[in-house]
Amino acid sequence: KVSESPISLSVKNLPLTFTLQEPEAVFVGSSSAIIPVLYDGSDIDLVQFSYLNPEGHKVNCTSTVLSAEENLYQVKISVEATNKPVKIEASLSGGLKTAATSIPVLTPEFTISAEEYDVWAKKAIVKLTAADPQYQDAVNRYAVLYTNSTGQWVHAASTHEGNVHTLTGLSPDTRYQIKGTCNNEQENVNYHGDCTIRTETAAGVPNGDFEDLTQTISVSDINQGGRWSPTIGNPTYQSTCSFTINEPVGWASVNAKTSNTSATNQMSWFVCPSTYNTTLSWTGKVPGIPIFGGGGTDTPDIYKNLTAKNGSNAMVVRNVAWDENGTTPPPHYKTRGSAYYYSENVPSIANRSAGKLFLGSYSYSGNSESYNEGTSFSSRPSTMKGWYKYTPDNNDGSETGVISVTLLNRETILASGTINLTAASDYTEFTVPLVYTVTDKKANLLKIMIASSNHASYSQSEETATIKTTDYYSRYESNSRGATLTIDNLNFIYE
């Protein structure tokens, strides 16, 4: 059958040449690129461009012809340049003919800088600054950092906010080179920002295991309590005690006050160490009585079987009563066996003090005391840990031991932390987090104060008013003491 209707034919001529040439690289963060297009058609505006965004979606581009030379056109298109090559597609006549290329990306120039106080033992805070401000957002978004401390570059663990990056997982006391890139997801990577830092040392607590000791007190045959007699009318006798105390090198106590070897009355009621080592030597001596006998020497029970958490020595701080000018109690007469050869008369004792152990030095003379706290220290730990035992006094059930840590730069407090230690019969681990309120200074001074009581004070009258002790008298001990804190194995943690 032959149609009588006219037939209309439409013929579309496609150009023989339509290709995209390799474009020049653009900086990460660029919003446009220039694409060389080889095209022998009559109207370059018929070519439509698109690119794949970071989510993989096709985005249409705006385009402008910048120049044309014979069949080669330089076309500027809108893009979003990320950290990997930008895939470009050009289409003609509704997609009947397409061409594709990829735009390589370059890391825009930037610097990496770090303030000295921003470099810690295991972390460092660095700032990335683009040479051209228009690329700062791209640097903030795409920069990846690498470190080198051994001759090999490794991807650095870091977090960032804006252009400030915090590198973590660093090694203490180590020199690092740092560089960065924004185009790490393409084959040809370029880097910028060479920077060199040295991390702080991860210094430990000075002599924190209390193993390095020096002798501070050696007392021989002072009166242990008052005089006593087994029967009324018999001669009276005097028990004595001898002891040697060692303290950790670099640390100080208030023993010069509580165990004052210059006190007018050298008696155990008035001269009582508030700090001592678990490896101390202490011997009580009871004189023998003619005919009856019953004398002997021994160590008081409180000083027996003392142990350290690790190593050979721990330190003990305790509340004690003391008196620089104490008066001897009257003799005590009794009619009991030799196990009771001691005086039960308790004198009036003027003062009560908490035991203290602290970094620094201490002096006492004529009712005047001086604390020189702290030691040179240039690291910045995040936490102090240690082990303790604590026995409160029966007269103050709410009492606790206290440990405080302070890091300073001269007079400026950088960080501090305090913990109250409650009753514990066995060694128990404790943690003191250090809260930093100033981070734009380096540390140069460390203070640690360990006290047997939360009533501890720099005022002697306040301590005497608030600290409780219990009187103890037995065959080999005569003193008034209270809450007791044993401490060992102090160490710093760095994060």
Describe the predicted segments one by one.
Residues K1-E4, L92-A100, E185-H192:
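Short, exposed coil/turn segments at beta-strand boundaries within extracellular/luminal domains
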Residues L14-E22, T107-E115:
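Proline-enriched interdomain boundary motifs that mark the N-terminal boundary
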Residues E24-S31, E116-A121:
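Short, solvent-exposed loop/linker segments at the N-terminal edge
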Residues S42-F49, A131-S149, N395-T400, K441-L445:
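Solvent-exposed loop/turn segments flanking beta-strands in beta-repeat/beta-sandwich domains
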Residues E69, I77-P85, L167-R175:
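Surface-exposed, short loops/turns at beta-strand junctions within beta-sandwich domains
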Residues L170-Q186:
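Beta-strand-rich modules
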Residues D194-T383, T400-T431, L445-E495:
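Aromatic (Trp/Tyr/Phe) and Gly/Pro-enriched flexible surface segments
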Residues Y390-E399, A423:
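Extended, low-complexity, turn-rich repeat/linker tracts enriched in Gly/Pro/Ser/Thr and Asp/Glu
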